[in-house]
Amino acid sequence: MLNSLKGLLSRKNDVPSPTVISLGQVWVDIMMDIDAIPQPGGFAVANHTMPSVGGSFRVMQAASRIGAATKHAGVIGNGPWASLIRKALNDNGIEHIGQDRIDADSGFRLVLNDSERKTFVATYGAESQGNENTFDCVEPGEGDVVHISANTLMDHSASGIDAFLHRTSSDPTTRGDDSAGACSTTACTLVPDRP
């Protein structure tokens, strides 16, 4: 009986596993723990500083950890922040299929944490410099999940999202069995009506 159950569990499933494809932006968060946000012109010393890869990376990392094939179709730059991003993607088994910018580094966010709230200061980089062709490399297969983050809808990369949705058809009766999901955050309130 045990061998029979083991045989059933070890059979390969004929249904292909879905791939998670993120069209989201990835950047580096530099977390700085401080006692208090300084007044304009003031000064603060960070008690702890920790760089980590952020943005859509966390969604991809979670998908990869549960065993889904995971791909990042966003733009990555060239420089120290981009190197940190590429290492994190590689370490987590996430394939980068998107464009590479050799003329700009990826961006970063300073995250000032005073234990009551977080204050963000962003500098955008290569991840925000897409265009209408940015996601031409993305061809979702049957059952694939496409992740779209609100941040990608806030800059030039939005035209790439628009072109992708028109190319792959947003009508589920003609699109097939792939799925698209948008990340719901407060950034959605900043998204313009059209790219």
Language model region names:
Residues A73-N78, I97-S106:
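Beta-strand->loop->alpha-helix junctions that form or flank phosphate-binding loops
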Residues M1-V26, R86-R101, D114-P195:
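Ribokinase/PfkB-type carbohydrate-kinase core domain
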